[in-house]
Amino acid sequence: MTMAMQPQTLVIKIGTSSLARPETGQLALSTIAALVETVCKLIGQGHRVVLVSSGAIGVGCSRLGLTERPKKMALKQAIAAVGQGRLMRTYDDLFSSLRQPIAQILLTRRELIERTAYVNAYNTFQALFELGVIAIVNENDTVAIDELKFGDNDTLSALVASLVEADWLFLLTDVDRLYSSDPRLDPDAYPIPLVKAAELAQLQVRTDSTGSAWGTGGMATKITAARIATGSGVRTVITHGQKPEQILAILQGANLGTQFEAQPRSDNARKRWIAYGLVPTGKIFIDAGAVQALKARGKSLLAIGVVALEGEFSATDAVIICDPQGQELGRGLVNYNCNELEKIKGLHSEAIAAVLGYVGPDTVIHRDNLVLQEN
């Protein structure tokens, strides 16, 4: 690929299944060393690299002699605090041996929900790129709450890729590519080398959603991550975590792993934030006429097109917009709370003031705050 010859922004996510030995949870130092060497080669070629690394809880469990991953949130958070220091020390030792500076960035969903924090995070990553520093990112497990957790580092890596406007997202896992089903369990499983943008939304494969004994991800979360990343214009690759050097070959055009074609990237960073940075708090169901107005004519969503709603949300919250079949059409920032919208749904805009007793916005969701899914 000719684009691979130019300096690119790369996000590389390595999972616990690749970082830790399954029988003990201890760090697989040979794999980490190979990853570090690969990343340094990428930097040497002029690429900008962010590394999203799992493993803090797994390493903490090993450090404390625990034989299984804890279930309780407080215990997981405490163990993550133990493991994160050990994990970063390992990275720092290995990168320092190659004279490569690194930085630690711990994120929660809050940093992506709040627009100011989102922009600040973007600026921090850009400054690190300019300094030639590799950012090593993990979820801040020690302070994250359930409502503001990414849930898995596959999702985190996709959102980071969207945030930094990456060209590539590499998801390193314990298989060499995506298969029609788990090849470790199904002898008839066949490899899927390429998933085109139009195919990804309908992709149905039998996957193990449980992940490894020490991690939280599985192939299902990687497909979800691919949908987020490719929707943000980021080409995504699933490849083997124990062979990180394959990243170099893939950038040169090698047919390795499974590649997910990227959709055209929106130049509007704020709309990417609405689509992927925010956590929707409700759903709005619209009629066929409203669907046509939004998709074909680029209009704002009006109250007359709203037929039902779901969830509790406030004005300016992110909501999912659904078509008459209940399929997600897009996302946007709503101008009314759920109680107000329940009263005015189906009404013409000029009738809203009489029903609410005050003058509100003409639109339920303005087109500037609306992001439609690609077909």
From Swiss-Prot:
<dbReference type="GO" id="GO:0006561">
    <property type="term" value="P:proline biosynthetic process"/>
</dbReference>
<dbReference type="GO" id="GO:0055129">
    <property type="term" value="P:L-proline biosynthetic process"/>
</dbReference>
<dbReference type="InterPro" id="IPR019797">
    <property type="entry name" value="Glutamate_5-kinase_CS"/>
</dbReference>
<dbReference type="InterPro" id="IPR015947">
    <property type="entry name" value="PUA-like_sf"/>
</dbReference>
<keyword id="KW-0808">Transferase</keyword>
<comment type="function">
    <text>Catalyzes the transfer of a phosphate group to glutamate to form L-glutamate 5-phosphate.</text>
</comment>
<feature type="binding site">
    <location>
        <begin position="216"/>
        <end position="222"/>
    </location>
    <ligand>
        <name>ATP</name>
    </ligand>
</feature>
<dbReference type="InterPro" id="IPR001048">
    <property type="entry name" value="Asp/Glu/Uridylate_kinase"/>
</dbReference>
<keyword id="KW-0963">Cytoplasm</keyword>
<dbReference type="GO" id="GO:0003723">
    <property type="term" value="F:RNA binding"/>
</dbReference>
<dbReference type="InterPro" id="IPR002478">
    <property type="entry name" value="PUA"/>
</dbReference>
<dbReference type="InterPro" id="IPR005715">
    <property type="entry name" value="Glu_5kinase/COase_Synthase"/>
</dbReference>
<dbReference type="InterPro" id="IPR011529">
    <property type="entry name" value="Glu_5kinase"/>
</dbReference>
<dbReference type="InterPro" id="IPR036974">
    <property type="entry name" value="PUA_sf"/>
</dbReference>
<keyword id="KW-0028">Amino-acid biosynthesis</keyword>
<feature type="binding site">
    <location>
        <begin position="173"/>
        <end position="174"/>
    </location>
    <ligand>
        <name>ATP</name>
    </ligand>
</feature>
<feature type="binding site">
    <location>
        <position position="13"/>
    </location>
    <ligand>
        <name>ATP</name>
    </ligand>
</feature>
<keyword id="KW-0641">Proline biosynthesis</keyword>
<dbReference type="GO" id="GO:0005524">
    <property type="term" value="F:ATP binding"/>
</dbReference>
<keyword id="KW-0418">Kinase</keyword>
<dbReference type="Pfam" id="PF00696">
    <property type="entry name" value="AA_kinase"/>
</dbReference>
<dbReference type="Pfam" id="PF01472">
    <property type="entry name" value="PUA"/>
</dbReference>
<comment type="pathway">
    <text>Amino-acid biosynthesis; L-proline biosynthesis; L-glutamate 5-semialdehyde from L-glutamate: step 1/2.</text>
</comment>
<dbReference type="GO" id="GO:0004349">
    <property type="term" value="F:glutamate 5-kinase activity"/>
</dbReference>
<feature type="binding site">
    <location>
        <position position="141"/>
    </location>
    <ligand>
        <name>substrate</name>
    </ligand>
</feature>
<feature type="binding site">
    <location>
        <position position="54"/>
    </location>
    <ligand>
        <name>substrate</name>
    </ligand>
</feature>
<dbReference type="GO" id="GO:0005829">
    <property type="term" value="C:cytosol"/>
</dbReference>
<keyword id="KW-0547">Nucleotide-binding</keyword>
<dbReference type="InterPro" id="IPR036393">
    <property type="entry name" value="AceGlu_kinase-like_sf"/>
</dbReference>
<feature type="binding site">
    <location>
        <position position="153"/>
    </location>
    <ligand>
        <name>substrate</name>
    </ligand>
</feature>
<dbReference type="InterPro" id="IPR001057">
    <property type="entry name" value="Glu/AcGlu_kinase"/>
</dbReference>
<keyword id="KW-0067">ATP-binding</keyword>
<protein>
    <recommendedName>
        <fullName>Glutamate 5-kinase</fullName>
        <ecNumber>2.7.2.11</ecNumber>
    </recommendedName>
</protein>
<dbReference type="InterPro" id="IPR041739">
    <property type="entry name" value="G5K_ProB"/>
</dbReference>
<feature type="domain" description="PUA">
    <location>
        <begin position="281"/>
        <end position="359"/>
    </location>
</feature>
<comment type="similarity">
    <text>Belongs to the glutamate 5-kinase family.</text>
</comment>
